[in-house]
Swiss-Prot record:
GO terms for biological process: photosynthesis, light reaction. This is Photosystem II reaction center protein M. The keyword Transmembrane helix applies. The lineage of its organism: Eukaryota, Viridiplantae, Streptophyta, Embryophyta, Tracheophyta. The chain crosses the membrane at residues 5-25. Belongs to the PsbM family. GO terms for cellular component: photosystem II; plastid membrane; thylakoid membrane. The gene is psbM. Keywords: Membrane, Photosynthesis, Photosystem II, Plastid, Reaction center, Transmembrane, Transmembrane helix. InterPro entries: PSII_PsbM, PSII_PsbM_sf. One of the components of the core complex of photosystem II (PSII). PSII is a light-driven water:plastoquinone oxidoreductase that uses light energy to abstract electrons from H(2)O, generating O(2) and a proton gradient subsequently used for ATP formation. It consists of a core antenna complex that captures photons, and an electron transfer chain that converts photonic excitation into a charge separation. This subunit is found at the monomer-monomer interface. PSII is composed of 1 copy each of membrane proteins PsbA, PsbB, PsbC, PsbD, PsbE, PsbF, PsbH, PsbI, PsbJ, PsbK, PsbL, PsbM, PsbT, PsbX, PsbY, PsbZ, Psb30/Ycf12, at least 3 peripheral proteins of the oxygen-evolving complex and a large number of cofactors. It forms dimeric complexes.
């Protein structure tokens, strides 16, 4: 089974971007 690199990157971005966004908001709120 071939791994679709573009699909993998898209999935990674879909997970990482909101996570980073929430982390930034949390840090700004905490400090």
């Amino acid at each position: 089974m071939e791994v679709n690199i573009l699909a993998f990157i898209a999935t990674a971005l879909l997970i990482l971007v909101p996570t980073a966004f929430l982390l930034i908001i949390y840090v700004k709120t905490a400090s």
